[in-house]
Amino acid sequence: IDELGRIVIPKEIRKNLGIRNGEALEIFTNEDSIILKKYFEVRKYEDLSGKLCELIKNIYNVDLVITDREKVISSSNKDIVENTKLNNKFLELIDNREMFISKELSTINLGIDISGYFTIIPIIASSDSLGLVIIISDNDNDYSSLGKLLAKIIADKIDIF
């Protein structure tokens, strides 16, 4: 603890735990312990994201995956396991706030290899990139407007609270 009362976490520990500068942490106390836990806005809305995944699958017949900055939080594809860690390609899309649309049949890895056409949109709320909306289809239809709408719904829900 520094002279201003702030908790200082050494760079090596931040690097090992994947804590970025300015990232939100939850602080818990337990008798003689202080517990720091990474805070993920998107995870608060797992129920909403799970319902969105099922709804979109039923209406559009596409698979929907919603992630936070580290892992899958909801998926309409039963083969994609929740809490699967994201690989570096997805992390780059989140950090760079980039949208990705595959124009040809391709494969991505979300714990297992998934083949299809992909639309990947970052979830941005309060100027922070919080995760991804991933639409997986078996046709080359343009789902970018649907992906943007879903990312906006999730971001707006986060901004409200």
Task: Outline where the language-model segments fall.
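A short beta-strand signature within small-molecule sensing/ligand-binding domains used
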Residues: 113-124
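Short hydrophobic/glycine-rich mini-motifs in sensory/regulatory modules
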Residues: 123-133
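A generic structural motif
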Residues: 14, 79-80, 136
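Structured interaction and signal-relay segments at domain junctions
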Residues: 53-112
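Fold-independent oxyanion-binding glycine-rich loops
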Residues: 104, 123, 138
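Intrinsically disordered, low-complexity terminal regulatory regions
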Residues: 1-74
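Juxtadomain coupling helices with adjacent low-complexity linkers
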Residues: 46, 50-55, 86, 90-91, ...
